[in-house]
Amino acid sequence: MKISVIILTFNEEQNIKKCLESLHQISDDIVIIDSYSEDKTIEICKENNCRIYSNKFINHALQMNWGLKNIEF
């Protein structure tokens, strides 16, 4: 069974690497929905082979629903 993980991010440069290292132990498909970070969040995610999408943040529920609707799993 393939497990996909969705992570919502915004300026998570300080935390995302450790999070991704943990998740790679359980999933090869990590999807990032970023809210136009201004730090190195995207670069770190690219280095860790994540699929990256950007969407304007309104709230957590809408951001997650946007991902579920627009991303192919």
Annotate the PLM regions.
Residues 3, 50-51:
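Short, conserved active-site loop motifs that form the nucleotide-linked donor/cofactor pocket
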Residues 46, 62-73:
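Active-site nucleotide-sugar/metal-binding loop of Leloir-type enzymes
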